């Protein structure tokens, strides 16, 4: 049900880690896209189970910035800043930098999210996330990334369902 393709081994400070997630939704492409580009909607589902987003600032256009502060169940704040590389009707590409307690980047995450209309109706969403430029000692922060993305996309499923859209047609491994 996670919709995830397992990564190749444990992340390391010199290795690139890539994760691919694919989900099919019985919702129009424009509605799935808006869940990624509207700050109010993104704040409702972004992050693992139990996380909230008290700050969610998005400027979804090429060169636009994003800033999110995820709050974990234990109260820990996980700030993320980034830049949109492309925002189109069928894809969103952005780079995120999770920050440490001093505001220094831990690593860089490049994500490409594509939205394809299905002939039978609905939308296939594919998320490709690649980790790059891991700071010395920051690899430990990557351990739960695949599970975190899976949980975040489960929250997106629930978000779309709460907005009156039927649950995804399928969650499959890419």
Task: Describe the function of each predicted region.
Residues 23, 55-58, 80-86, 108-117:
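Hydrophobic/aromatic beta-strand elements that line small-molecule binding cavities or substrate pockets
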Residues 20-21, 40-77, 168-174:
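Short beta-edge strand/loop motif at the mouth of beta-sheet-based domains
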Residues 1-52:
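Hydrophobic ligand-binding cavity/cleft-lining segments
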Residues 13-15, 60, 74-78, 103-107, ...:
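A generic structural micro-feature
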Residues 1-13, 158-174:
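Basic/polar N-terminal segments that are highly enriched at the extreme N-terminus
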